[in-house]
Amino acid sequence: MKKRYFNMIPSPDTACILLYGEIGGFDGINDKDIVSELYEYASMYRSIDVRVNSPGGSVYAGMAIFNALRASDADITIYIDGIAASMASVIALCGKPVYMSQYARLMLHSPYGGCYGNKEEMKAVAEQLEALEDTLADMYASKTGK
């Protein structure tokens, strides 16, 4: 049986996707599976509700999910059930609209990572982190208008 990385709860016009867990990693939310299932659901449902409870995770896996949600023909509504931290907060930007309980949390931070290597390799990683930070700031600014 295929492992499902999130649950889909159908209704006549709306699919509800539960995006719970860490994005990326061995046991986390797999972007390839999510994106392929999202495209499948978008072809069957006019609206997709995405319920988020995630500490975040891989920036690049999250970007793939973000881009798929943004490109979807379905109307995407995001509900933050518990926490949308780190990359999950970026995925939450896809909602038109976004709903959040007064008890839920939205948490942001600059991207981070590590590396081993010589000074040129370390400098390249620092430059990549700066570029990612600029990209993420643009994404937040686009949603908030600030």
PLM region descriptions:
Residues M1-K146:
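Terminal-region recognition feature
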